[in-house]
Amino acid sequence: MTDNKNLGGSTLLPAYFGEFGGQFVAESLLPALDQLEKAFVDATNHPEFRQELAAYLRDYLGRPTPLTECSNLPLPGQGRGYARIFLKREDLVHGGAHKTNQVIGQALLAKRMGKTRIIAETGAGQHGTATALACSLLGLECVVYMGAKDVARQQPNVYRMQLHGAKVIPVESGSGTLKDAVNEALRDWTATFHESHYLLGTAAGPHPFPTIVREFHKVISEEAKAQMLERTGKMPDVVVACVGGGSNAIGMFADFIDEEGVELVGAEPAGEGLDSGKHGATITNGQIGILHGTRSFLMRSSDGQVEESYSISAGLDYPGVGPQHAHLHSTGRATYVGITDAEALIAFQYLARYEGIIAALESSHALAYALKRAKLAEEEGKQITILVSLSGRGDKDVDHIRRTLEEKPELILKEEER
């Protein structure tokens, strides 16, 4: 694999975020990437495409999504006005998560390009579900690659994809998780790109995917900024989102990046602990390298081999991260922190018990960080407003969480915490 930049090629849009990004792919895929970039630039400059996309976001996805303030959480110092936590409710998007935002955009783009077949990868099944429903809506063939382990732990989403007419292909190779599903999807696309579009589900991969995914997800932060100004009269102090590959986070960060007074925080999966060897905290504990066509942080061994990631949340179980997140980290514009499985499970239970919201395990990582910051605000005697990307709903996780809590009863909320 070589980088298009080093082949003397050129791109219409910047292919790098600082030192991160690029097109580290087989030369046979470069024409497909060039075609995709040109189609994206043409489409987003075309009023009819923008109007069609806006109509689907409004009438099919249900945008704008609401902003909900947590009013019942037993926050430290809440009665003294230290912390206010607001949730951007991407769990209410049709399909159950933020994923559908950019899936509709890419599917419309693929149809505009004359593609008849959509290839996708999925971890938790949310991206696969979003892709399947978009293909059903737009009359496109849909093939979804999913790690065999993820198929086993996300059966409801597998069935949902099949109900929408998608062919779900379990991937047994490697660790049988998201990384391996991406590998198989890329192999498929390499062989079939003349009729197929690879609908990448995260803000990673070779250029122009990180830019395309960000631009189609930017609606999250555009809405949230306007809603926060309307509700509070000011910007949030902290914006937090979970980070696996980084799609919901880059959508949530995008419109706040130039707001210097807003702190951006990505909550990575620390799994069983950053020193346990079982985590997916790519930026917090990773190294710079190349994975799935892009230069970014990844989990790899001293001899350069990609290591297996781990998270209780299938959607965060990925050993890489989008290149713009790597750049935001390296420049200090955003901070990335590890949240353990246990912390996410506690946050999940708090939100369900006190606010009546079943959040995805992915989103629960972001909420767990918000709860930590609320406690810190009380200790410091400072007021703080925290905006959380509630990236998806947790229906898919309920059985998994029930089994986990049965195995680890010490993580069940105590009566006094209820």
Curated annotation (Swiss-Prot):
Pfam assignment, any one: PALP
Coiled-coil annotated spans: none
Listed EC numbers: 4.2.1.20
Stored InterPro entries: Trp_synth_b_CS, Trp_synth_beta, Trp_synth_beta/beta-like, TrpB-like_PALP, TrpB-like_PALP_sf
Catalysis performed (reactions): (1S,2R)-1-C-(indol-3-yl)glycerol 3-phosphate + L-serine = D-glyceraldehyde 3-phosphate + L-tryptophan + H2O
Keyword Lyase belongs to the record: yes
Keywords from the named record: Amino-acid biosynthesis, Aromatic amino acid biosynthesis, Lyase, Pyridoxal phosphate, Tryptophan biosynthesis
Cofactor(s) required for function per UniProt: pyridoxal 5'-phosphate
PTM sites of type N6-(pyridoxal phosphate)lysine: K99
Keyword Transcription: no
NCBIfam families in the record: trpB
Function: The beta subunit is responsible for the synthesis of L-tryptophan from indole and L-serine.
Subunit structure: Tetramer of two alpha and two beta chains.
HAMAP family documented for this protein: Trp_synth_beta
Family: Belongs to the TrpB family.
Protein name, entry field: Tryptophan synthase beta chain 1
Naturally occurring in which organism (per UniProt): Corynebacterium efficiens (strain DSM 44549 / YS-314 / AJ 12310 / JCM 11189 / NBRC 100395)
Lineage: Bacteria, Bacillati, Actinomycetota, Actinomycetes, Mycobacteriales
